[in-house]
Curated annotation (Swiss-Prot):
Species of provenance: Methanocaldococcus jannaschii (strain ATCC 43067 / DSM 2661 / JAL-1 / JCM 10045 / NBRC 100440) (Methanococcus jannaschii)
SUPFAM superfamilies in the record: HupF/HypC-like (SSF159127)
Gene3D superfamilies: 2.30.30.140
Protein's name according to its UniProt entry: Uncharacterized hydrogenase expression/formation protein MJ0200
Record GO biological process: protein maturation
Superkingdom field: Archaea
């Protein structure tokens, strides 16, 4: 099972003939290989990343719903620690 947070694509790069997305979540950027996707990824898209590969492109609506759920979880965990 994979738990992935939607990341917003801020850059598309090409290295050694392979396309990668640079995606960001809360200021943290990571590089994801795009070879597993059958859909073209654009700057501004939201993707799910696992082990360095983009697994899925999400609609903005789905990404925002998921991000809201993650924020609720983080807030609940923070409250439990206090």
């Amino acid at each position: 099972m994979c738990l992935a947070i939607p990341c917003k694509v801020v850059e598309i790069i090409e290295e050694d003939g392979e396309k990668y997305a640079i995606a960001e979540y809360k200021g943290v950027k990571q590089k994801a290989k795009l070879t597993l996707l059958d859909k073209e990824v654009k700057i501004g898209d939201y993707i799910l990343i696992h082990t360095g590969y983009a697994l899925e492109v999400l609609s903005e609506e789905d990404a925002k719903l998921s991000l809201e759920a993650w924020e609720e979880l983080f807030k609940a965990l923070e409250e439990m620690e206090q």
